[in-house]
């Protein structure tokens, strides 16, 4: 199977070819392996390959499932496959081999997916870009030297480049939607509790995080959620069960929806790039053309307390993880050593206050959603940006060093907040819905003048992924994007120069 033919198909289409015996699962896998070997030197997106295991999976009898035989990759964070390395983007875990297989991975394998590798992530997923010190930055297939987003940047890069039609991703503050916007993909963060996180963990980041996939088509995202959703024994909570298959919801019929449009930043403290404003405006016009009732809406979510709550919960969880699993803190990236110190400094009452605020935001949005079926926002505040743009500056790096050497007299938490500001200013519309637990999806329905993708975010009521799939399929039909592939020739001087810059280290 040639690369040009392989890339034409989404996961559902490729699975149909395999089911109809037009191609075999081993043929599809070998096409994916060739794509990986040809493109990953330029993408720097795949950090571990499992070709031998994948060949055994492809050659075995496939289950009679809608995605059987499809090549697939796991994000190198959260999801374990027994006997396979999981580094979580950290030098501290380079020797870690998974002792078990997590429930979600088991569901993927049970559905006949052929897992051939693991994709890059920032250390512990603690960034909106994918630039782990241990592996270097992951390139965006649309342009060398531009971020693929994070923390699921490796997965987004390989899907956008046509290495695999879909890849696992996870989202604690936007980490499915950010790279989907940057790389021109469909990226759904499901409802809190929709997909399992066990058997070891009960929730991620105290309910902020969720797992799903990044894909090129709406029907693929729906098909994967049909495969993976549902609680497991011992879950602390579960999402409301769907009325039927998500693939069926995506196929229509379409109904007129009440849609609220947030024209700027949810938090009101960030000015969006003009390209992002245009994307939302054009989307609102398209929705009206399609017969939906569209009106502007203000959410009333302010910047400061929400950001602090997000950072508090993620820092405390990181500090807990490092201590519980006896991770060598000295091997962490300096900024994440600050996160650990900040998390350790949070008092029990401060933690409880911030957890309460997260739940309170859910109440606020729940009332807003009583009058709307869907909210629309820009996914990001800007089009995708160059590598290292969010790294701490020289003065911040000096204070980080002082903290780690015991010379710093200030607050570790305040230093962490300051370091995070650049990133949080790029994602004012993603993290609020990690707090509320609502399903939120980025769709690739706009291109900047530069040619870079600009995603638009669609947010549903709690538990109503079906509404999002139905609307997304309608938009995909009205403004199809499946034919859009990033121009990428890894043999060009442009890519070689980008790779040289990426490997040379952080800018001054």
Regions found by a protein language model. Name each.
Residues 100-232, 434, 438-446, 450-455:
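Short glycine/serine-rich loop segments
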Residues 22-30, 59, 245, 274-298, ...:
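Acyltransferase
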Residues 414-435:
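Alpha-helix-centered segments that form part of catalytic cores
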Residues 54-134:
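Acidic/His- and Gly-rich active-site-bordering loop/insert found
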Residues 189-283, 301, 478-508:
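A short helix-breaking turn/cap at a secondary-structure junction
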Residues 67-90, 248-262, 313-366, 379-415, ...:
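Short helix-loop capping/hinge segments that flank enzyme active sites or metal/cofactor-binding pockets
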Residues 1-49, 289-291, 450, 484-508:
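An N-terminal boundary/leader segment
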């Amino acid at each position: 199977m040639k690369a040009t033919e392989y890339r034409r198909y989404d996961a559902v289409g490729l699975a149909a070819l395999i089911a109809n015996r037009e191609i075999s699962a081993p043929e599809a896998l070998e096409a994916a392996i060739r794509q990986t070997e040809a493109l990953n030197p330029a993408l720097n997106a795949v950090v571990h390959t499992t070709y031998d295991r994948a060949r055994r999976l492809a050659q075995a009898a496939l289950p009679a499932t809608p995605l059987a035989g499809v090549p697939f990759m796991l994000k190198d964070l959260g999801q374990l496959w027994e006997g396979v390395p999981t580094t979580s983007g950290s030098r501290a875990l380079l020797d870690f081999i998974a002792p078990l297989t997590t429930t979600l991975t088991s569901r993927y394998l049970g559905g006949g997916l052929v897992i051939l590798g693991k994709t890059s992530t920032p250390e512990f997923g603690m960034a909106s870009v994918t630039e782990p010190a241990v592996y270097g930055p992951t390139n965006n297939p649309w342009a060398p030297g531009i971020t693929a987003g994070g923390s699921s940047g490796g997965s987004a890069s390989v899907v956008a480049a046509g290495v695999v039609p879909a890849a696992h991703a996870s989202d604690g503050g936007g980490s499915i939607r950010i790279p989907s916007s940057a790389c021109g993909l469909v990226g759904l963060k499901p409802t809190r509790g929709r997909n399992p996180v066990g058997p070891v963990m009960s929730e991620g980041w105290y309910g902020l995080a969720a797992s799903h996939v990044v894909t090129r088509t709406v029907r693929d995202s729906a098909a994967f959620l049909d495969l993976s959703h549902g609680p497991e024994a011992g879950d602390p909570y579960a999402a409301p069960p769907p009325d039927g298959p998500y693939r069926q919801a995506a196929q229509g019929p379409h109904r007129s929806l009440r849609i609220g449009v947030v024209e700027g930043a949810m938090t009101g403290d960030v000015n969006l790039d003009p390209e992002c404003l245009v994307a939302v405006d054009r989307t609102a016009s398209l929705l009206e053309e399609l017969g939906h009732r569209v009106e502007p809406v203000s959410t009333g979510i302010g910047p400061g307390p929400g950001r602090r709550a997000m950072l508090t919960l993620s820092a405390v969880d990181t500090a807990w993880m490092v201590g519980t699993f006896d991770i060598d803190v000295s091997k962490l990236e300096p900024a994440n050593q600050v996160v650990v110190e900040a998390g350790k400094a949070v008092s029990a009452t401060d933690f409880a206050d911030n957890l309460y605020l997260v739940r309170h935001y859910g109440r606020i949005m729940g009332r807003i959603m009583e009058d709307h079926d869907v909210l629309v926002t820009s996914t990001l505040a800007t089009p995708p940006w160059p590598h290292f743009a969010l790294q701490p500056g020289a003065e911040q790096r000096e204070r980080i060093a002082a903290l780690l050497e015991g010379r710093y007299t200030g607050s570790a938490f305040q230093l962490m907040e300051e370091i995070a500001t650049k990133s949080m200013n790029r994602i004012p519309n993603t993290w609020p819905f990690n707090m509320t637990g609502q399903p939120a999806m980025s769709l690739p329905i706009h291109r900047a003048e530069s040619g870079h993708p600009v995603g638009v975010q669609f947010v549903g009521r709690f538990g109503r992924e079906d509404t999002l799939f139905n609307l997304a399929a309608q938009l995909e039909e009205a403004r199809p994007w499946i034919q859009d592939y990033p121009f990428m020739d890894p043999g060009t001087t442009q890519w070689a120069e980008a790779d040289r810059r990426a490997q040379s280290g952080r800018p001054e």
